[in-house]
Amino acid sequence: MAGQVVQYGRHRKRRNYARISEVLELPNLIEIQTKSYEWFLREGLIEMFRDISPIEDFTGNLSLEFVDYRLGEPKYDLEESKNRDATYAAPLRVKVRLIIKETGEVKEQEVFMGDFPLMTDTGTFVINGAERVIVSQLVRSPSVYFNEKIDKNGRENYDATIIPNRGAWLEYETDAKDVVYVRIDRTRKLPLTVLLRALGFSSDQEIVDLLGDNEYLRNTLEKDGTENTEQALLEIYERLRPGEPPTVENAKSLLYSRFFDPKRYDLASVGRYKTNKKLHLKHRLFNQKLAEPIVNTETGEIVVEEGTVLDRRKIDEIMDVLESNANSEVFELHGSVIDEPVEIQSIKVYVPNDDEGRTTTVIGNAFPDSEVKCITPADIIASMSYFFNLLSGIGYTDDIDHLGNRRLRSVGELLQNQFRIGLSRMERVVRERMSIQDTESITPQQLINIRPVIASIKEFFGSSQLSQFMDQANPLAELTYKRRLSALGPGGLTRERAQMEVRDVHYSHYGRMCPIETPEGPNIGLINSLSSYARVNEFGFIETPYRKVDLDTHAITDQIDYLTADEEDSYVVAQANSKLDENGRFMDDEVVCRFRGNNTVMAKEKMDYMDVSPKQVVSAATACIPFLENDDSNRALMGANMQRQAVPLMNPEAPFVGTGMEHVAARDSGAAITAKHRGRVEHVESNEILVRRLVEENGVEHEGELDRYPLAKFKRSNSGTCYNQRPIVAVGDVVEYNEILADGPSMELGEMALGRNVVVGFMTWDGYNYEDAVIMSERLVKDDVYTSIHIEEYESEARDTKLGPEEITRDIPNVSESALKNLDDRGIVYIGAEVKDGDILVGKVTPKGVTELTAEERLLHAIFGEKAREVRDTSLRVPHGAGGIVLDVKVFNREEGDDTLSPGVNQLVRVYIVQKRKIHVGDKMCGRHGNKGVISKIVPEEDMPYLPDGRPIDIMLNPLGVPSRMNIGQVLELHLGMAAKNLGIHVASPVFDGANDDDVWSTIEEAGMARDGKTVLYDGRTGEPFDNRISVGVMYMLKLAHMVDDKLHARSTGPYSLVTQQPLGGKAQFGGQRFGEMEVWALEAYGAAYTLQEILTYKSDDTVGRVKTYEAIVKGENISRPSVPESFRVLMKELQSLGLDVKVMDEQDNEIEMTDVDDDDVVERKVDLQQNDAPETQKEVTD
């Protein structure tokens, strides 16, 4: 027997075909969300308050500091928040200290700073009752970047950019005349030496002494028109602020605020880390020949002699000396923007490949402390030096698509940035109030206006591009959403501008970002998914784990190191499937490995690391595809994406052929209920589980608190499917931490179960499976194999209008009693009623304009105090094509203290309607290998082809769908699935380490099947065997969310657009089908003049004609000739609005009057025809 039996969760054993033992457990798959939010609450908020404190007034007398904060208890718990359409949030209270410096008085107060949304345990937020996810954003890391570019003459040039987290950009570039320029904040360019002079290097000689002599610098000095620091400062001021009178002081303060003011310029800790790394002498001196000795500044001893070539070993030896500022120089700058002395490290090296022995100076930034978040003059000088070194052939340019240069902004940081915007707006208000208020009676509470803070948080959660409505179609969709990485959003790329290179797979994605899972369409490559083992470090770079190789014994150790993409560039990494002996040494002398972007074969002694698992390359969804290694990547992409669209079925079933990932994905998705502590199950019922904690103290186990786990029963998910949880533990079971207690939707016994295992034959059948169509047995309909439950929510609000309040009532004008049969005495449908489209769910009337009362009405009004009100029917009805059984009704009243209702709403009624949808012709189905199709025919069970033992097969697929698509994984799954079914087992075939051909065939033989996996099939209609033997097996097929019930649509009489009077389009508007210009050509080609005329007039926008046609049909008369279509009138009006006098003439050159229709009768009749409410409809006008 191939493979070994592995336990997945409490209830499921699978035969696993993996050959590589897992050395590392998969991490919690949603920790990217939870950890980031924890960091925000623990450090992010405090850091922000620290950045903004103290706020001082313009005189410096008052100072406001934020000392500490705490989060209170949420007003509503999670469930209540969802029911009430509220936000699940806790009040944020900040301790604020106000110091009045004149008197020395200190006032402390706790100030309420708004409700702060809390993250749920599953990594989501509940905003206005809906679950949302904050998607992590991939952005360029703040740092210094050097790029190579080819100018129009074909010469190689370079440019450089210093990108901060926020603040002004600094760019260097060369021109055709070899002059080096600088741009400050995207303005016009200046010679680079102007900026150097402004920093305090006044004369030409000082600049040459600093940077070393070279022709580029000489050309730049010639171009530079300034002669000293003052002139340079004035020159920069004129460039940045043209039109304003320049003074030296203004210029200094402008330059200071652009680059050296911490409130305006921020590299962030990641920017400082990257800048120090880029400008560090270690990488820049590698393989260079020294033109001067390296001296230890503290002791004065020579560490490395002149003329030495520094290899990696030599550099490692002198690292300590380099970092303790070897060859450092300190410059006292006079008249500069910054008065502090500037320290740099400067080492001369020989220019590579130069016969004349010229030298160039390599300048380092002397390693500023990680707390320095601004750019320093040393950074600017070192970056200029790097630029001149590049021109001399020393140093490397950067690859912007490398993941060492792209980082993640997760929830915590995105929230922090948003909060910072709110606080800085608040800071302005505080300053203004400080100058107005009386210092005697002033309190912190009076100074602080929390509105901008609340607004910025609300705006972020409600309308940011990165705050997305969670896709809850199934557990895998939830999981993938939380692990999604988007390059779009504020501060990111835009779809239109993103080039091929950004979207493409890069070698640095290995183990960090999935190369397969990405959407098809305009977002391809811009939205990605985190790989299964990847994690995010403190700077936001994605790290992936590797097993360390012992450099002495060359054996694999159990030590696991997480490496970022640029750290990995220094090492050689062996693949996870390299053969090892029992001591962990490589068995082959030559090992397949990766070094940077190259896959090569190297000697085993050169290995530094080894992959931890074959599935570390791919994401969670892709790792659920068995035999992924046998599928073409394009089809695997579709397979990974379509699994997320699978509808939760009524009777889910885990796959016979899985990958072992199903259990982990289900557990971490948030759809299952997991144990928060170890304990014993005390009570189980359908809607709650009680677990008594088991606590161990001094080796003795005793009982602790009782944990209560409520289960969600038949709730509506975000995507309109049924969200239901079922217990899978029994009373008395001892459960471990994080063990699954209850299955969620699309789960079975603690494993993800997106579809069903069905018997599939690859054969044609009367051409019904042409073009990927699917032929299905009626058994799957009768036995509810692919039946799903869908819940739709409808709501109706009773508002205050100008003419009086709307009312929810059973008393609706002009409605028959039979239409009210499902309503209770309040006018609301009762639970359990069966409704179809057009039925009233909530009876509601809205007051019409008040008319003058007659004498009789005035008398009645005087007697009864109630006039016969003019109301119109605005009841909530079941929309077209919907219907089902009323599952639940929720009523919210303002009188009963429901403060979550929006302003002007007195009452809100929500009705939930449930539908049981069996599978139909027209529904979309798919397998896990990108093999998708639409059901074309549902065949009676007795007509389906049957196996030799008489069992009819369930589904027939077209064999032509396999060879050209190159997704052979489905065929292997088919055979192994049949074997698993016959043996009564479940199997796991992990990606890139699953069952090979021999395993599949040996399992088939073990199951007693034919060696080739094929069988004779008999035609159910004739009983004759088919000519050839056919591949029949068990495949896991999913029903997708694209169901025909949601798409089928036909218009009767519906709404028209206001301006053109043409029917609206789309199912939501109850619209018509567009008859476009190509369709007009088709009718013209047939000469079908009358058909064409009625399509362009009566059936479209001839307002008079359509009313008269209706009349003629009702009265049985002949239909009159059409009049002028409305769109022609609109065209004339548009031409007239351009000042053109347009007239319409008949054959006798008489003008045809184009009068506007004012026929009241026509307008009224038109209203009667339109029963449906829809956007910008004619009805709104005529009311």
Curated annotation (Swiss-Prot):
It is an enzyme of class 2 (transferase). It comes from Staphylococcus aureus (strain Mu50 / ATCC 700699). DNA-dependent RNA polymerase catalyzes the transcription of DNA into RNA using the four ribonucleoside triphosphates as substrates. This is DNA-directed RNA polymerase subunit beta. It catalyses: RNA(n) + a ribonucleoside 5'-triphosphate = RNA(n+1) + diphosphate. It holds the Pfam family RNA_pol_Rpb2_2. PROSITE patterns: RNA_POL_BETA (PS01166). One of its GO terms (molecular function) is ribonucleoside binding. Its EC number is 2.7.7.6.
